[in-house]
Amino acid sequence: MTDILNYNKSEEIFSAAQQLMPGGVSSPVRAFKSVGGQPIVFDRVKGPFAWDIDGNRYIDYIGSWGPAICGHAHPEVTTALQEAIEKGTSFGAPCVLENKLAEMVIDAVPSVEMVRFVNSGTEACMAVLRLMRAFTGRDKVIKFDGCYHGHADMFLVKAGSGVATLGLPDSPGVPRTTTANTLTAPYNDLEAVKKLFSENPDAISGVILEPIVGNAGFITPEPGFLEGLRELTTENGSLLVFDEVMTGFRISYGGAQEKFGVTPDLTTLGKVIGGGLPVGAYGGKKEIMSMVAPSGPVYQAGTLSGNPLAMTAGIKTLELLKQDGTYDKLDSTTSRLIEGIIQSAENNGIAINGGSISGMFGFFLCDGPVRNFEEAKTNNSELFGKLHREMLQRGIYLAPSPFEAGFTSLAHSEDEIDQTIEAFDESFNAIKN
């Protein structure tokens, strides 16, 4: 492993970028604000690795924030894309590839009987909220503290991801009237949800959540929590929506709803289903989805929705994921990684708790367990920043925020896991004092 990496070109390019783009980035967490140090400018990726513009190689545990589940630039995906691009980049009209990916999603995800493709997870969540309200005739929605459903105005209330990373309470520019119907509760707290329903009779359109929180760190549902939400929403004539933009096709082929055996009414998807290209989707029961235009009155549209390149990458990625043993391998790889991380911290007397499910993991530098966003905020963020910088110097690229989950891929081998655990040993030893 490299002791001191040269970031000269990254520094030069990022300095120029700050004069061209707000903060020098196209998405806030990339600016390293919460961890300090020099943001890395990447040049190329392949398998489990990423190379920066200075030629430094990293073992990557971000995976483009989740989509690269088969490894970066998988040859079957890139070959399929090369063939598809010869036919054009976008049609702005129906194409048979939409049918094929739709069939695959419907076949895999228990709640989805019909699906609409969009261009991002944010778009999917915006559209699904409009649909929830139209179907129920109610305006209010319940979300959970620290859960992130994109940057649409109505969801920027106690949000996770970059909002949590930057320590923002909400966002300026969002009128109070826009979020007046957004109710919040602590994750894993059924009693708080019951109270909201009792205080707002016949007014709540539904509950939306990340079934596994990945945008406030990595927080799993306690036994009975998802089941309880299913019962509460049904009893109150409301809809249950799983935001599986992150967990869909990652923790199992059918997502969190398959893993936990709880079927929502509607589901949002993204990341993995685009194979690394911009994509989003929302789907659910036919009686609800039939309200979406042009079948029904709920309007939603997109110039590049269902474009042939994203559909091609998604189809090929799902074909790879459907092969036998895929999720067993992800689970084995990631379990070994998180066990090694926790053991390394404990060996150095550093408080830690964490976990993993399939190809998704996370840890907090604090005593656990962490069951919600308030408890996640007890994480030692200063220590995490030091850890991140030490790991970067050892060629390991972690999410530059303690409030983001990490990801493994099918391309991560035992060698990469061994190198990573060794780097954690060295890094924890370096920062413990």
Swiss-Prot record:
Enzyme class, first EC level, given as a word: isomerase
- Listed EC numbers: 5.4.3.8
Pathway assigned in UniProt: Porphyrin-containing compound metabolism; protoporphyrin-IX biosynthesis; 5-aminolevulinate from L-glutamyl-tRNA(Glu): step 2/2; Porphyrin-containing compound metabolism; chlorophyll biosynthesis
This protein's GO CC annotations = cytoplasm
**Per the record, what are the reactions this protein catalyses?**
(S)-4-amino-5-oxopentanoate = 5-aminolevulinate
Looking at the keywords, is Calcium present? no
Which cofactor is recorded for it? pyridoxal 5'-phosphate
Could you provide one GO biological process annotation from this protein's UniProt record?
protoporphyrinogen IX biosynthetic process
Q: What is its main location?
A: cytoplasm
Q: Which residues carry this modification: N6-(pyridoxal phosphate)lysine?
A: K271
Q: Name one GO molecular function term.
A: transaminase activity
Which proteins does it associate with, and in what oligomeric form?
Homodimer.
Q: What is this protein called?
A: Glutamate-1-semialdehyde 2,1-aminomutase
What organism is recorded for this protein?
Prochlorococcus marinus (strain MIT 9215)
The opening ranks of the lineage are: Bacteria, Bacillati, Cyanobacteriota, Cyanophyceae, Synechococcales
